[in-house]
Curated annotation (Swiss-Prot):
InterPro entries: Chorismate_synth, Chorismate_synth_AroC_sf, Chorismate_synthase_CS. The gene is aroC. This is Chorismate synthase. FMN binds at R132, S133, S134, N253, A254, G298, K313, P314, I315, P316, T317, R339. It comes from Shouchella clausii (strain KSM-K16). Reduced FMN (FMNH(2)). Its cofactor is FMNH2. Keywords: Amino-acid biosynthesis, Aromatic amino acid biosynthesis, FAD, Flavoprotein, FMN, Lyase, NADP. It holds the Pfam family Chorismate_synt.
Length: 390
């Protein structure tokens, strides 16, 4: 599968076109809307989320609740568009009109795409960069991931995410018996954290950041359970699934690091405390005693749950802005201020879930075919049985 997104933060809509989705997949708008609503939640979100109530329109590739195999188009309208029709419209306006609207951005925000994008594409108004580089685009990336989750669930694979850290406050109690328990407990927390004490401290830290006109980041974790052995490949660098997942996570706005399994901790431990011993039983087939490698060996899944962590930096838009330079006058000024969040880590955990789900679903279809769901499901079942008896 592949997808292409289009649209600006304050434009009329966001659009995604997805190609390669199997036919005979039951798909409803509510499957997508559920993930969109989760993305809009989480403690620390800004005023924009009070305006937008994201709902998807499925305008192609699905008929009577079933995919046809044709390209699928998702559209999500921006409710705030009505306030930006002149500013963000496609029709030309005069410089005088543009000046009156006072929405021209000439003071780049440190940590954002503003200045680099303006230099690259020759924009004197950095709004042309801001509007597309905004995390608002993750709305339709989540929609694509929601579709991927439907495919995975139909093949017995579940995805869940939670927050491990916000503003230096770490969750200590992160144990869970099943991925369903992880999903439930994460959803019950305003910051999607499994540790109740840490959740309260995280919310207090978010409140303080908001009061100080600042922002804070954190660490999220995504778990994928029920994965067949052998997704991805060792035969070439660009077919390694852990590499694809790492690249996808790093492509999320404001993400600056990624770990698979114990990640960087592996550099501090001897091999005997890093690699997972292999066992076999008639009931379960091949398993690992531990899962320090996060479900991957040689760029391929080993049947254990995939475990991925992503590091999100603090959002660069600050209500007490850092120093910048006006690109017109070259004089020092405080950076521009746009409506933003104090902390988007809980929402980012949902984005990360769906980005990882997309990569795993793609690998699943690469391995087991992609024409129609019943054939894929049968192939996955045969593979599970063959792996157990190997």
């Amino acid at each position: 599968m592949r997808f292409l997104t289009a649209g600006e933060s304050h434009g009329p809509q966001l659009t995604a076109i997805i190609e390669g989705v199997p036919a005979q997949l039951p798909l409803l708008a509510e499957d997508i809307d559920r993930e969109l609503a989760r993305r809009q939640g989480g403690y620390g979100r800004g005023r924009r989320m009070q305006i937008e109530k994201d709902r998807v329109q499925i305008v192609s590739g699905v008929r009577h609740g079933m995919t046809t195999g044709a390209p699928i188009t998702f559209v999500v309208e921006n409710k705030d568009w009505k306030n930006w029709t002149k500013i963000m419209g496609a029709e030309p306006i005069s410089e005088e009109e543009a000046e009156k609207m006072r929405r021209k951005l000439t003071r780049p925000r440190p940590g954002h795409a503003d200045l680099n994008g303006a230099i690259k594409y020759g924009h004197r108004d950095m709004r042309n960069v801001l509007e597309r580089s905004s995390a608002r685009e993750t709305t339709v990336r989540v929609a694509c991931g929601a579709l991927a989750k439907v495919i995975l669930k139909a093949c017995g694979i579940e995805v869940a995410g939670h927050v491990r850290e916000i503003g230096g406050i770490r969750a200590e109690e992160t144990n869970y018996a099943t991925i369903q328990e992880l999903q439930k407990r994460s959803e019950e927390s305003p910051v999607r954290c499994l540790d109740e004490d840490a959740s309260k401290k995280m919310m207090a830290a978010i409140d303080k950041a908001k009061q100080d006109g600042d922002s804070i980041g954190g660490i999220v974790e995504v778990v994928v359970a029920g994965v067949p052995i052998g997704l991805g490949s060792h035969v070439h660098y660009d077919r390694k699934l852990d590499g694809k997942i790492a690249g996808a996570v790093m492509s999320i706005n404001a993400f600056k690091g990624v770990e698979i399994g114990i990640g960087f901790e592996a550099a501090r431990l001897p091999g005997s405390q890093v690699h997972d011993e292999i066992t076999w039983s008639e009931e379960e087939g091949y398993k690992r005693k531990t899962n320090r490698l996060g479900g991957f060996e040689g760029g391929m899944t080993n049947g254990m749950p995939i475990v991925v962590k992503g590091v999100m930096k603090p959002i660069p838009t600050l209500y007490k802005p850092l120093q910048s330079v006006d690109i017109d006058s070259k004089e020092p000024f405080a950076a521009g201020v746009e409506r933003s969040d104090s902390c988007a880590v809980p929402a980012a955990s949902v984005v990360c879930e769906n980005v990882v789900a997309w990569e795993v679903a793609n690998a699943l279809l690469d391995t087991f075919g992609s024409d129609q769901l019943p054939l894929i499901q049968a192939a996955v079942e045969r593979h599970h049985a063959a792996s157990k008896e190997f």
